[in-house]
A protein has these predicted regions:
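Histidine-rich, glycine-flanked metal-binding segment
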Residues: 2-58
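Divalent metal-coordination and catalytic microenvironments
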Residues: 14, 27, 32, 54, ...
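Conserved protein kinase catalytic core
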Residues: 19, 59, 69-71, 97, ...
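Short, well-ordered amphipathic alpha-helical segments that serve as non-catalytic structural scaffolds
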Residues: 41, 77-80
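Redox-cofactor binding/interface segments in oxidoreductases and associated redox assembly factors
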Residues: 51, 63, 69, 91, ...
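Di-metal (Zn2+ and/or Mg2+/Mn2+) metal-binding site signature of metallo-dependent hydrolases
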Residues: 55-78
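Divalent-metal coordination cores built from histidine and acidic residues
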Residues: 79-195
Length: 198
């Protein structure tokens, strides 16, 4: 592997936190990626140096389960995340309450809402509602960058939430073909409804 002879930034003097240890080290950054971690004298020269003396240095943190519908919007959520040291949020994408908004339409609307107000990076995780228009627009939503989805075999009393086996299998095939991931709540909606009514 080639070693960079020059990087954009070096963060020095702090305690670097990795997944396995905390150590005195410097971090070399090129573009938006960590190029090297180690003693400063072994790192390439940089255009900019940041003094982290007395501080902990961590890579950007990711919150992969965020709800930003209701009181919080994307701008406020991003501001709170940045203050907390998060650099990426993966909120649940939501559908318009009126009409039959497709998954593609929801993705485009949310991309517009995030727009330039975002101080952090965003990814999205969508619940695949039990509506033909959602499944039909799934491949296009994946082409637009959404790769994480959730489905439910329960919540029978919530419109469009509970999915039958055929719908789930079709969605799983489509998500796999597009290189995505799908989380499934596997409780039995019929048994839960029976127990709720008992």
């Amino acid at each position: 592997m080639a070693v960079d002879t020059h990087v954009d930034t070096i963060v020095r003097g702090g305690k670097v936190v990795t997944s396995s240890q905390v150590m005195d080290a410097a971090v070399a950054i090129k573009g938006e990626k960590i190029a090297a971690v180690g003693p400063e004298h072994l790192l390439p020269k940089a255009d900019r140096y940041i003094d982290a003396e007395g501080k902990f240095v961590l890579p950007g943190l990711i919150d992969s389960h965020v709800h930003l519908d209701g009181h919080d919007d994307y701008a406020l959520g991003a501001l709170a995340a940045a203050h907390a040291g998060l650099t990426t949020l993966v909120p649940f994408g939501n559908y318009a309450l009126e009409g039959d908004e497709t998954l593609e339409q929801a993705v485009r609307r949310i991309q517009d809402e995030v727009g330039t107000a975002a101080l952090v990076d965003f990814g999205f995780h969508f619940i695949l509602q039990n509506r033909p228009s959602i499944l039909a627009s799934l491949p296009r939503a994946m082409e637009l960058g959404v790769k994480s989805f959730k489905m439910f075999m329960t919540y029978k009393k919530r419109p469009g939430r509970m999915c039958d086996d055929d719908y789930i299998c079709n969605a799983m095939d489509m998500v796999a073909k597009g290189g995505g991931v799908l989380q499934l709540h596997c409780e039995s909606g019929n048994i839960i409804e029976y127990l709720e009514n008992k």
